[in-house]
A protein has these predicted regions:
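Short, acidic loop-to-helix structural element flanking the phosphoryl-transfer center
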Residues: 118, 186-245
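Asp-based phosphoryl-transfer active-site loop
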Residues: 128-148
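Short glycine-rich phosphate-binding loop at a beta-alpha junction
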Residues: 136, 248, 392-399, 521-524
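Conserved phosphoryl-transfer catalytic core
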Residues: 150-185, 333-338, 441-459
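Substrate-recognition/cap helix-loop segment adjacent to the acidic, metal-dependent catalytic center
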Residues: 237-244, 249-275, 414
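Conserved Lys-Pro-Asp/Glu-containing loop-to-beta segment of HAD-superfamily phosphomonoesterases
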Residues: 282-308
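Acidic, divalent-metal-coordinating active-site segment for phosphoryl/phosphodiester hydrolysis
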Residues: 306-321
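Long, contiguous domain-sized segments
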Residues: 364, 372, 379, 430-431, ...
């Protein structure tokens, strides 16, 4: 076995693939020999070298292999030879034949994700565990969760504190090498944190003690209880069972004592720790130690997330087991694959915890948590940075898209003046009829062509009488008579303006009060053309002569699939409009994949809704006019509930890692992009919902 292990270093590609077969032959030979544990260690050494040769040396192979294993965890545990065969095929494809790598496309569950990872309730799980005398709990990814999709992502944070670039790679390599050294010297893979940081210190120049202290404190600070397992744990304790903690880990026992106490896991009998006992779950000997401690006649059960260490090995040593799926592996395919490393990792971990470790939630709430929370939080930070850089005196959040944004913004940034402003596309078009008559005609006339509208309906929405334009009330607007109606409106703009006299007075009074004492204003809207900001700027300065500077921010802009895709390009170019997520010059992949005709605008706007009716415009004597009803009021509240819960969860982590608060527009939009990548997902979520179609003026079923 030793000779076989040593020759791997000099093998070429084809020889390596052959070794994959020899590995399994060696395995079956070993298990029949008497010195079982010594041979297991030798086999693990060969396996590690083979893994490095087949998988670790090619990033593309490693990426696809790890994705495959995580997606087929059950199959991998039962038949690892299939996974190794897949690794061989990947090497042939990417190392020998050099095929181009294809991106693994994210996929989205079509419906409610929550509660689907682990089928049993907390009561059912506790009852099953209580069938034994001694109940053993795994720690990480079972009792305790890290706020990262991958455990190694914690090393990003430690590296930042230590001031060492690429520390994640360095730290992982040092741990791997420490295990090799331990195996060569003591025939064991169980290492301590000190063993690891002895190598880290040698390779980075930092003090080993300082590095260990930093990792110890960072891990302790960031780790949190799995709420589902905390409930199970307390129920088992309440039944009077002997509870023990069993873990393969390099941290000392005092770390686990502090970690478990901090997160509410008290009352256990003992911690069985691999690095202090010299044996682990990975080779099965830790289970034998437990039985020697409590007696072989007792009934034992262990719950954990690793099919090999926690399930297969435990069963081989007489334990009953409960498999608790690793939530981050289970949900890997359903999270965005194109977010930045740290923020993407934290985002995925929080979503996985919320959906799989807590009580099931509605699909609407889930949509708000998954897609809206990070978008609202990131957008608020973008708004704040923009306000500071532009010396803004006051921020105007447009109704209704600005409702949840203002609520969160005011909570996070109380030092900035804000106002929730009743402003809508309809009101803006009327008040700017003489400034932008083409837009007025487009909104009220052209967009209703061929939709079975009568002239009476159209001009009533304009608060005018069609008879004043010599048009028959019952006549339907068609392509055939469109030009006649357009010209009738263009030729009567002064008359239209005079009809809106009371509206102008009310609007001027309203905005003078809002803008009093402010010279630099920032408007906030969801999207798309930016006409709300453009028209407010024109109204305040060209009609009301207020002499104020108006800049607008948008979550997203018009895309190339719209007829007026370049409506505001000059405003975007000169900085009068600032996009957050995408525009023709920002994050082009999102710009090109956002399709309004596939209802992407509607789904996006639902993340920014408000639980009150639409603003219709200004009446006389300062009157504000609203629609008679609010569509989707409960739906909006449920979405906001999910968004606020995500924000609370994220800010809890952000309090310990401050720099993850600066969320890029790309990261903020990525979960929504993943959601719309499955055409059935959102259409199913919103099957019974309606939206206010501003183009047609009607409420339409989504």
């Amino acid at each position: 076995m030793k000779e076989f292990s040593e020759i791997l270093n000099g093998l070429d590609n084809l020889q390596i693939y052959s070794c994959a077969v020899l590995y399994f032959i060696a395995f079956y030979d070993i298990i029949n020999e008497k010195s079982y544990y010594r041979k297991v260690v030798q086999l693990m050494s060969v396996k590690l070298k083979l893994y490095n040769k087949l998988i670790n040396r090619n990033r593309t192979v490693k990426h696809h292999y790890e994705h495959y294993v995580a997606s087929h965890e059950s199959l991998h545990a039962k038949a690892p030879v299939i996974s190794w065969g897949f690794a061989v095929l990947l090497n042939i494809k990417y190392s020998l034949l050099r095929f181009p790598d294809k991106e693994i496309k994210p996929k989205q569950k079509a419906g409610n994700e929550s509660g689907t990872s682990f089928r049993m309730t907390a009561d059912e799980t506790a009852d099953l565990l209580c069938t034994a005398d001694v109940v053993s709990f795994d720690v990480f990814d079972t009792l305790i969760l890290r706020p990262f999709a991958s455990p190694a992502d914690l090393f990003y944070i430690i590296g930042e504190k230590l001031g060492i670039p690429d520390f994640r790679t360095v730290r992982k390599k040092c741990e791997s090498d420490a295990r090799k050294i331990k195996q060569q010297k003591e025939n064991s893979y169980e290492v301590t944190l000190g063993d690891i940081y002895e190598l880290v210190a040698h390779r980075t120049g930092i003090s080993a003690e300082y590095g260990m202290k930093t990792e110890y404190e960072t891990e302790l600070s960031l780790c949190r209880a799995n709420p589902f397992m905390l409930e199970v744990y307390k129920k088992v304790l309440a039944k009077g069972k002997t509870v023990i903690i069993t873990t393969d880990m390099y941290m000392p026992e005092e770390f686990f004592t502090a970690l478990l106490h901090k997160n509410g896991f008290d009352g256990y009998d003992r911690i069985f720790l691999s690095c202090e006992s010299g044996c682990g779950k990975s080779d099965g000997r830790l289970y034998e130690m437990i039985k020697e401690q409590y007696g072989k006649e007792k009934r034992y059960i262990h719950i954990g997330d690793n099919r090999h260490s926690d399930i297969s090995n435990a069963e081989k040593h007489g334990f009953k087991t409960v498999y608790y799926p690793n939530i981050n592996n289970f949900a890997r395919d359903f999270r965005p694959h194109d977010m930045s490393y740290i923020i993407g990792s934290v985002y995925s971990a929080l979503v996985n915890e919320r959906l799989y470790c807590r009580k099931p939630c509605s699909a609407i709430y889930e949509y708000g948590y998954k897609c809206g929370g990070i978008l609202v939080l990131g957008y608020c930070n973008f708004i704040y940075k923009t306000a500071k850089s532009k010396n803004i005196d006051k921020i105007l959040f447009f109704a209704r898209d600005g409702y949840i944004l203002k609520k969160i913004f005011d909570r996070l940034y109380p030092d900035v003046k804000t106002e929730y402003v009743y402003w809508s596309r309809t009101a803006a078009a009327k008040l700017c009829a003489d400034i932008f008559p083409f837009d007025y005609v487009r909104r009220f006339i052209e967009q209703k062509t061929g939709r079975n509208y009568t002239f009476e309906e159209i001009f009533s929405a304009m608060e005018l009488s069609c008879k004043d334009f010599s048009l028959m009330p019952g006549e339907i607007l068609t392509n055939g008579n469109l030009h006649r109606v357009q010209e009738a409106v263009y030729n009567n703009i002064p008359h239209i303006t005079s009809c809106y006299a009371d509206m102008y007075k009310s609007a001027e009074m309203y905005f003078k009060k809002i803008t009093e004492g402010s010279k630099n204003l920032l408007t906030v809207d969801c999207g798309w053309a930016g006409s709300g900001s453009i028209m407010l700027d024109a109204l305040l300065n060209r009609k009301f002569c207020m002499n104020v500077n108006v800049i607008g921010v948008l979550a997203g802009t018009n895309t190339k699939y719209q007829l007026d895709s370049d409506f505001s390009e000059t405003y975007l170019a000169d900085g009068k409009l600032l996009p957050y997520c995408f525009s023709s010059a920002l994050n082009r992949r999102y710009y090109e994949n956002h399709h309004p005709d596939m209802k992407h605008n509607i789904y996006f706007e639902l993340l920014f809704g408000a639980p009150h009716p639409s603003f219709l415009g200004f009446g006389s004597d300062g009157e504000l006019k609203f629609d008679v009803e609010c569509e989707n009021e409960q739906l909006v509240k449920d979405i906001h509930s999910g968004e606020e819960d995500f924000i609370n969860d994220y800010l809890e982590v952000c309090g310990k890692i401050s720099y993850i608060g600066d969320i890029s527009g790309s990261d903020a939009y990525a979960p929504f992009a993943a959601a719309i990548s499955d055409g059935k997902y959102l259409s199913g979520v919103f099957a019974d919902s309606v939206f206010d179609d501003t183009a047609s003026g009607r409420k339409t079923k989504i």
